[in-house]
Curated annotation (Swiss-Prot):
It is found in: Cytoplasm. It comes from Azoarcus sp. (strain BH72). This is Probable RNA methyltransferase azo0122. S-adenosyl-L-methionine binds at G151, E152, S181, S204, L205, H206, N280. Its cofactor is [4Fe-4S] cluster. Pfam families: Radical_SAM. Binds 1 [4Fe-4S] cluster. The cluster is coordinated with 3 cysteines and an exchangeable S-adenosyl-L-methionine.
């Protein structure tokens, strides 16, 4: 379901813009449709009031909690079941943050990512994206949403921008606390500056070498790292939000002194933050995370050379922390043949 479809249905029930906003705000913020001045029964059209119970049940069914996996760091990884029975992952982050998925699967095919191994199964509608926030708000407050879960937001741009617009208006989330994460796509840099709600931007860089980037992200748009940084810098200066560059640290792949010097050349003097994220090793893939001391040394090197850098850990690292790992494990278990129960012998 898309937000636009939802608003069209509300209008067909006689809703004016003020009625739409009352209903949407109550849904996204999990609040009452009554306010201090006027009860919903005295404000909403009769046809809309009569349709609300069924509509509310339908919205609640867009995203249901299948399982919750608390992490030792205070985060929690959520396996979310959609209305068609498919599952995606969301992650409750520290300091009232939430990471949401935008696609079921992913077409980019990052070689180090579990989500990309399945390819793209389907897009999530904008209402399904927002429903992950609504579900999370039933568990904790959510004041920041990062679009960094399963999927590539740039490949589902209309739905993601529609979700961002609702979250940044009726959802009550500050624009800079909505973070659009992408491997880089020219359409993103064309459309984001024109939006009513302009999110912060996170760019997945992972290497300063164009040839290695093409190997690691085989189906991403072939934008050279230097051009990607230039596009990011333009957006950062126009919005006043620094670009967050994402760098998954993989031992022996992109953790060399040459790569760190490349980061310095690209980012020194830029309105930017480099997030170094040690890779979450999984048995199915050959990549490995560098040691803690080595990762700390890399972040310190960047600091000394004028690049603001943070060493981050994937939230919920101890509970299938890499993107798509939890879903992959559950899908694998669901596909496992079930053993019939033995019938006890009769006397």
């Amino acid at each position: 379901m898309r937000i636009d479809d939802l608003t069209q249905r509300l209008r067909a029930l006689g809703a004016k813009p003020a009625h739409e906003q009352r209903v949407l705000r109550a849904w996204v913020q999990r609040s009452s449709m009554d306010n201090r001045r006027q009860a919903a029964k005295d404000f909403l059209p009769l046809a809309l009031r009569e349709a609300l119970p069924a509509l509310t049940a339908e919205l609640e069914g867009l995203a249901r909690l299948r399982s919750q996996h608390p992490g030792e760091d205070g985060s929690a990884r959520l396996l979310v079941e959609l209305a068609d029975g498919q599952t995606v992952e969301s992650v409750l982050l520290l300091r009232d943050g939430l990471c949401v998925s935008t696609q079921l699967g992913c077409a980019v095919g990052c070689v180090f990512c579990m989500t990309g191994r399945e390819g793209l199964l389907r897009q999530l509608g904008s209402a399904e994206i927002v429903a992950q926030v609504v579900l999370a708000r039933s568990l904790r407050p959510v004041k920041k949403v990062v679009f960094m879960g399963m999927g590539e937001p740039a490949h589902n741009l209309d739905n993601v921008l529609e979700a961002i617009d609702l979250l940044g208006t009726a959802g009550g989330i500050g624009h800079k606390n909505l973070v659009f994460s992408t491997v880089g796509d020219y359409r993103v840099f064309e459309r984001l500056p024109r939006q009513r709600v302009k999110p912060a931007l996170a760019l997945s860089l992972h290497t300063t070498r164009a040839d290695l980037r093409a190997q690691l992200l085989p189906r991403a748009p072939q934008i050279a790292p230097q051009e990607l940084v230039e596009l990011g810098e333009r957006y950062a200066r126009s919005t006043g939000y620094p670009i967050q560059y994402q760098w998954t640290l993989i031992e022996g792949v992109n953790d060399s002194p040459e790569e760190m010097d490349g980061i310095v050349r690209l980012l020194r003097g830029k309105y930017a933050l480099m997030n170094l994220i040690p890779y979450n090793s999984v048995p199915e893939l050959e990549f490995r995370r560098p040691g803690r001391e080595a990762a700390v040394a890399l972040a310190a090197y960047l600091h000394r050379h004028g690049v603001l850098a943070k060493l981050r850990q994937s939230a919920g690292q101890d509970v299938e922390g890499g993107c798509g790992q939890l879903r992959a494990r559950v899908v694998k278990m669901d596909r496992r043949p079930r053993t019939a129960r033995a019938t006890p012998p009769t006397a």
